[in-house]
Every structure is written in structure tokens, then in C-alpha cells.
């Protein structure tokens, strides 16, 4: 029998939702509530393919959920709130405590709160959503799905930093990795598309959006990933620097008189493509600027692609080879140019890709861009974190 599952991504002043019919993975409706707690909150819901938008004051997440459930009934999406069978909540940080998704109890809620020091901007906001749904829908399973969980299979040699070991033991300082739900979804989908058991595949997953991370997935398990203790580490991103020499932080402080917090703000919000180009963090803008001869925009694109290129080589070495390279997320799914730059020169490791196929895969299309004879397959897969969340609600919420 079909179940209706809500996949939720709660921010401090927003609530993104998708209602999914399982196990068919059929999208029933989706929407977004913005400016929660502020004047003129915006509620957008998709009804029969059309977006319906209303503006009203919404004081908190409980009221937001209430309004969402009322809208479901008003638009005949459900007859009654009891039609909803479970909810799944994206939680950014599960630390070492949560190596997989988990049914939410009071104890789990408390542990997510304790992990807030590892994700102070995200976990408290994710909790607001969890508490609102548990209050208004107390009789159904609620499941937490952690961005970090998929990477908990990394070995010590991948997740430890070369710092005094007691920093790891005392403060939990280690690599955690993020985008786990996306990496898990696309790796499973790649195996399906190849009609091969995931246990037999070495996959390099490139989740490239405004935030970007690369993962080495061996036999379905993450063995390394580019993001670290925080999502600031790894490759160049839209506004994030990615890896830098840590000694640069005190050096910049000394030269500019800025505090550590201010420098961190620069690394998170004023660096990456935006910092390098000086104009935009949006790859589409930079591509246009580069075409019209702006050298710095071209340079930003070159740096961006070269960092990803380097991780692919590194992770192929870690897994003693690679069978599949996956591109996903906004840029990975849509930028013909970045995919081409990243794949350039990888023939030495068995990557032979077809420029024509590459040009044809845009806007949510899925498919292979390698030549048939290529030992390494290259595939573009639109990520679907919400379906992955719904699957985990079925599994961990006891609904199967």
C-alpha cells in the first residue's frame, strides 16, 4: 500500500517541503515557506503544476507547518492530516553519533541539539522543523537524515587531521564530509543505470553546485570526501574558498586588522568564484563574462575546474582505479563547459568522453557522456535528495 511521506528541509526562517508517494517515488506536491518570523512571510505551493503564492505573517515554524497542512487540505492534496504517514528531516550534522538515518525520539532530538556546536547555523534550524512536525503530527514516525552519515564509513586514515590526536578525542576534530544524501542517491542510481551491483563499482561522485564536494565511493561506501570538519573545505565553490594554507588566516588578520571571525566570514562568503572573479558567484554569469573577454572570469572558471580535476585523480589513486565518474547538482547537471574542463586530459586513466553527448545533457536530463569503448563510464545524474530522504523514512520509520 502506498504511503505519503513529507521530505523536509528547515532553515532558520524557511521551510522547504516535498510530499512524495512511496514506494513509487511520485512527487505529489512541493513548496517553500520563506521569511518565517518576519513580516510578509511568503508561502508557495505547487498545485496541478501551477505555483500558488500567498503572503501573510507567519510567526514560527509551528504556524508554518499548520498553514502548510491546511493548504494541503484546501487544495485537495490530502483529505485529512492523518493521510500523511511519515516525515523525513534533513539534518546537516550527525557527528560520529549517527552513522545512518534514525527515527526521532526525545533522546535523538537532544543529541541533535548537542551536535549544534559542530553546525551552529544549521542544526538549530533543522531542529525547529523537527519540533514543529512532532508537535502537530505526534502519531507518525519522524526520521532524521544526516548530511554527514554516508561518510561515516571513511577509514581513520581518511578522516583524521595531522593534529595532536587528543584534539580528535577531546573535541571531535576530524573530517566529517557533507552532501552525503546526494552522493548516496547518485551512486545508487549510477549502479542501476549500469545494471551492476554497487558492491562491484568504484565511483567518484562530483556534487557541483554553489557548494561543491567530491566523494570516493568504493563498493557503495564513502571512503573519502573533499569537505572536512565544515563545508568550507575542499574544492573552490561559489563563495567558499575550499582548501587554503591555514597559516593564511593569522597572516590576513595581521595585514588587514580583521578578527578571526571576520576572516572566516570572508572565506565563507566572499571567496571562491566570487572572490577570484570579483564579479559573481554564479557560473552562468562568469561563463558569459569569460566569453566576452573578461580574463579574471575565465581564470576563476579555470581554477574551479582544476581543483575538481585534481580530486578525481587523487580519488582514482585511493581506490586503485575508477569505474564511474558522476556529475550532479546545479553545475554538474547543467554546465557543459565545466564538465569538459574537468574531464580534459583524463584519457590516461581510461576516460574517453563524447563532446556531442556532453552538449546534449542539460536541464534535468540523465545519461552517459562517455564513448561506448571508454573503460571508465561518465554519467550525469540529477540529484534527488528528497527521494533518498523518503526512502529512509520508509526504512527507518518502520513503514515498509
UniProtKB/Swiss-Prot annotation:
Its EC number is 2.7.2.1. ATP binds at residues 16, 207-211, 282-284, 330-334. One of its GO terms (cellular component) is cytoplasm. The active site is at 147 (proton donor/acceptor). The record marks 179, 240 as: Transition state stabilizer. SUPFAM superfamilies: Actin-like ATPase domain. GO terms for biological process: acetate metabolic process; acetyl-CoA biosynthetic process. It is found in: Cytoplasm. InterPro entries: Ac/propionate_kinase, Aliphatic_acid_kin_short-chain, Aliphatic_acid_kinase_CS, ATPase_NBD. One of its GO terms (molecular function) is ATP binding. Mg(2+). Can also accept Mn(2+). Pathway: Metabolic intermediate biosynthesis; acetyl-CoA biosynthesis; acetyl-CoA from acetate: step 1/2. Its cofactor is Mg(2+); Mn(2+). Keywords: ATP-binding, Cytoplasm, Kinase, Magnesium, Metal-binding, Nucleotide-binding, Transferase. CDD domains: ASKHA_NBD_AcK_PK. It catalyses: acetate + ATP = acetyl phosphate + ADP. Substrate binds at residue 90. Mg(2+) binds at residues 9, 385. Belongs to the acetokinase family. PANTHER family: ACETATE KINASE, ACETATE KINASE-RELATED. Catalyzes the formation of acetyl phosphate from acetate and ATP. Can also catalyze the reverse reaction. Homodimer. This is Acetate kinase. The lineage of its organism: Bacteria, Bacillati, Bacillota, Bacilli, Bacillales. The gene is ackA.
Amino acid at each position: 500500500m502506498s504511503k505519503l511521506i513529507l521530505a523536509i528541509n528547515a532553515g532558520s526562517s524557511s521551510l522547504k517541503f516535498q510530499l512524495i508517494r512511496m514506494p513509487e517515488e511520485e512527487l505529489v506536491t512541493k513548496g517553500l515557506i520563506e521569511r518565517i518570523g518576519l513580516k510578509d512571510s511568503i508561502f508557495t505551493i505547487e498545485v496541478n503544476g501551477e505555483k500558488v503564492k500567498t503572503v501573510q505573517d507567519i510567526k514560527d515554524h509551528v504556524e508554518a507547518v499548520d498553514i502548510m497542512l491546511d493548504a494541503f487540505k484546501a487544495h485537495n492534496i490530502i483529505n485529512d492530516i492523518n493521510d500523511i504517514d511519515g516525515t523525513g528531516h534533513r539534518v546537516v550534522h550527525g557527528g560520529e553519533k549517527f552513522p545512518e538515518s534514525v527515527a526521532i525520539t526525545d533522546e535523538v532530538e537532544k543529541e541533535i541539539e548537542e551536535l549544534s556546536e559542530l553546525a551552529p547555523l544549521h542544526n538549530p534550524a533543522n531542529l525547529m522543523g523537527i519540533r514543529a512536525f512532532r508537535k502537530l503530527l505526534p502519531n507518525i514516525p519522524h526520521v532524521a537524515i544526516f548530511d554527514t552519515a554516508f561518510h561515516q564509513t571513511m577509514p581513520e586514515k581518511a578522516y583524521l587531521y595531522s593534529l595532536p590526536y587528543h584534539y580528535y578525542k577531546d573535541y571531535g576534530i576530524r573530517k566529517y564530509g557533507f552532501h552525503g544524501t546526494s552522493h548516496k542517491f547518485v551512486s545508487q542510481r549510477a549502479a542501476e543505470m549500469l545494471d551492476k551491483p554497487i558492491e562491484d563499482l568504484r565511483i567518484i561522485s562530483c556534487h557541483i553546485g554553489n557548494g561543491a564536494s567530491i566523494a570516493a565511493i568504493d563498493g557503495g561506501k564513502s571512503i573519502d570526501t573533499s569537505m572536512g570538519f565544515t563545508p568550507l573545505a575542499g574544492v573552490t565553490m561559489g563563495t567558499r574558498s575550499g582548501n587554503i594554507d591555514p597559516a593564511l588566516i593569522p597572516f590576513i588578520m595581521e595585514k588587514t586588522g580583521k578578527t578571526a571571525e571576520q576572516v572566516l566570514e570572508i572565506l565563507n562568503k566572499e571567496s571562491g568564484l566570487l572572490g577570484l572573479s570579483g564579479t559573481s558567484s554564479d557560473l552562468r554569469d562568469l561563463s558569459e563574462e569569460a566569453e566576452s573577454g573578461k580574463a579574471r572570469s575565465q581564470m576563476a572558471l579555470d581554477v574551479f575546474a582544476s581543483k575538481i580535476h585534481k580530486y578525481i585523480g587523487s580519488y582514482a589513486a585511493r581506490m586503485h582505479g575508477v569505474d564511474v565518474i558522476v556529475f550532479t547538482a546545479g553545475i554538474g547537471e547543467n554546465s557543459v563547459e565545466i564538465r569538459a574542463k574537468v574531464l580534459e586530459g583524463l584519457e590516461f586513466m581510461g576516460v574517453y568522453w563524447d563532446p556531442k553527448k556532453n552538449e546534449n545533457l542539460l536541464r534535468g536530463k540523465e545519461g552517459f557522456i562517455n564513448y561506448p569503448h571508454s573503460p571508465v563510464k561518465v554519467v550525469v545524474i540529477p540529484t534527488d535528495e528528497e527521494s533518498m530522504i523518503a526512502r529512509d523514512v520508509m526504512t527507518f520509520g518502520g513503514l515498509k
